[in-house]
């Protein structure tokens, strides 16, 4: 608890202000965007997962952190620091996302709130996991966000890849792309399973070393 | 003038020497070719792929957006990094004026973006020319390529370089990323259409239709082209204005 509190203090007020600003922007879009736009799908399956990744890349810095050497020298393992930092940032973003979902649901009622949470969690978890992985690899600032951003944009642009068999099981934005075969729950489970595998790898590699 | 040219030169060279620049260029070229390489399967799938102008048109919709996204990130810390590394104090101690510094950063970023974007198109066009299974005259590739360099690459480079250099020096870079990601997702989500496209599209707006037009819809939407051009150049230039107005950015002369 103490560590989470200190991570929240390090996080500061800026991310909270940016997230609050986003909630306001989404509320305005929900009111004025009209019925042609399915805001719940594009907002919570596509936009907010990448925003979660940006926040982890920018505020959950690991190797790019100015104090990395000092922190690494003090402990036997990096993993607890990585976990506390990443989970704190992810939870903060998710809190605001859920708030935004409630507002959008109240205004537009496009899809049920629980479903919005489900469609948000798996791409957000996947992109955030990749960002954490990049945070552990790259020492330069913004590189993690850049790498994840390119993956995110590529995934968005390559909807046509869904014509290949099995691709729809690992495609990040299955609901947004139409989900022709009704397999979105399986898709979300597969993506979360892949994330779990990556996290297991991170824990195994960084569990016993501090660099 | 010489001082301004020095700032532009160092800005340009420093950016070009970054490995990430070549990483972004390579990734966007590979991604574009994965989509539009003139292989047997792609030729069967994509109707007009044998036409060089269509290939360039398609490259502008697909890989170019990824390239501009990457370049935007690479340019976004150009002012902040001077502050962080202490270079700014060094520059401010030299007889460089605020105007020279800002223009140097902006123009250096612009020439860099224009170079990388041109290389992106040139590499794609070269691969297309070499591997297309029918005989195509070199001029058939060079004409749409040259048109794209002027009609598309120039305004897109002004937009990307100016907003990426200027805005993060005014607002938190993370807020800039968040706003930029919303703009890029709107770009990625907009389907290609023969009708008037939204004005806010970066690489795939109506300007692109001056390179290639669908034979069934051979008309040019002048309003759309003007709006797209105005958005790209206007936003780029307007975003630079607060830099000049911000007093904190420079010493008191």
Model-derived regions: residue spans:
Chain A
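Aromatic-anchored segments of alpha-helical transmembrane domains
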Residues: 23-31, 94-102, 149-160
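Helix-loop-helix units of permease transmembrane domains in multi-pass membrane transporters
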Residues: 57-90
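Hydrophobic alpha-helical transmembrane segments that constitute the membrane-spanning cores
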Residues: 83-109
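Hydrophobic alpha-helical transmembrane segments of polytopic membrane proteins
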Residues: 115-141, 194-200
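Terminal transmembrane helical anchor/hairpin motif
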Residues: 144-211
